[in-house]
């Protein structure tokens, strides 16, 4: 069992009706227009005359209201704070929850060293503002020693008071509780992804997932290498056989304890480090392959979140964990393995390992007869070629694929529905086994990978595959509520889909 000490993953969030005396900074929103910026009014929480004076000062120092632009000015004597931070919201006509979320995140990133901030962004959208501040303030500093750790002036904001007209109202409290739980789940997934492979290998990942599940009241099952061998999980074992750090399969189950509750299966790729194996990757950028368990991190966080929210849906996460390494014991191009369930596969490329571990897990997940199955993985470089670093690709059964993509776009993770062209399926045929793990060409790699997984999804299951090869990890500068490193995508998509299933079946 992991002995790692938990640390706060974000600021303390609280509701407030007025700007308190202990607040250091007031954060307000600023929209842009052809006539100049305008303050997004705080529903009477801040005196309108005060806001007018603030706007005059902001215009004088060049604030424009451009999305995510931040401008900090001294506070007037009429406000009980030291300074005011205006964050751009962009065009008022185009303002939506995701822009509020991103602007709140941008504000949080600039509040280093602040003890307590209050904000009027919560009047515009309480949930989005709460999520944005919590996620924008997230930092991963676990491996900074005392000599390089951030000083007090670089610490993230410790507390954010979200101003609303009725802070004691049940609706406000429920909204904040949900948003805080979602932000914590996203941060948990980020924490897993950001932890280096020296410290998060399959056994350790399994221990941490088990600890999270146990603490959340979930049913937990962990299969070690002996159990995997006994039960015929050839994909997971094949990928993991080159590493001295042996593979695991973790299952976390949440029961709504409700008769005829919908059943949702989640599957996430958990390659704790991916060298490519014998088909080794180029050295440049390989350090980012610490993120190759981003799908697993997301599904672990999501099933725990479903339990925390008490959703009336049964949710089970099946999580294969392995390290893909080259060695004298590693699988070779040309080897044949047997996936869980009996399908034989010719391994043409050992760097197409994610689909091998996912296939085992999908077959196992389908043995529970779920109504819906969502798998997610940092699966293909082709996803980034087709859609870039911020847009997940969604494939699967048509209706459910479109439903997942629509919900993802609504909540700001912006997944895009993609096809699975039937003509690509024959390119996965093998001359010596049931399937090959890759095609013999480079075209449509993301789509072909989904077609491979489709072979293992049981008939009648509504299925969506979310490829997050780019979106799971931000290797560039921060933006909105997203810092460098793990992003937590697609936790918010998956929990929103599960909530939609709870509401509509």
Curated annotation (Swiss-Prot):
Localization terms from the record: Cytoplasm
Residues binding Mn(2+) 1: 274, 351, 353
Residues engaged in binding Mn(2+) 2: 269, 274, 292, 353
Transmembrane intervals: none
Cellular component aspect of the GO annotation: cytoplasm
Gene Ontology MF terms in the entry: manganese ion binding; metalloaminopeptidase activity
Xref: InterPro entries: Leucine_aapep/pepB, Macro_dom-like, Peptidase_M17_C, Peptidase_M17_leu_NH2_pept, Peptidase_M17_N
Classification via PROSITE patterns: CYTOSOL_AP (PS00631)
Primary localisation category: cytoplasm
Pfam families given in the database record: Peptidase_M17, Peptidase_M17_N
Active site per database record: 281, 355
Details of cofactor binding: Binds 2 manganese ions per subunit.
Enzyme class: hydrolase
GO biological process, one term: proteolysis
Classification via CDD domains: Peptidase_M17 (cd00433)
Keywords from the named record: Aminopeptidase, Cytoplasm, Hydrolase, Manganese, Metal-binding, Protease
This enzyme's EC code(s): 3.4.11.1, 3.4.11.10
Catalyzed reactions per annotation: Release of an N-terminal amino acid, Xaa-|-Yaa-, in which Xaa is preferably Leu, but may be other amino acids including Pro although not Arg or Lys, and Yaa may be Pro. Amino acid amides and methyl esters are also readily hydrolyzed, but rates on arylamides are exceedingly low; Release of an N-terminal amino acid, preferentially leucine, but not glutamic or aspartic acids
UniProt cofactor(s): Mn(2+)
Similarity remark: Belongs to the peptidase M17 family.
Role played: Presumably involved in the processing and regular turnover of intracellular proteins. Catalyzes the removal of unsubstituted N-terminal amino acids from various peptides.
Name of this protein: Probable cytosol aminopeptidase
Native species: Rhodococcus opacus (strain B4)
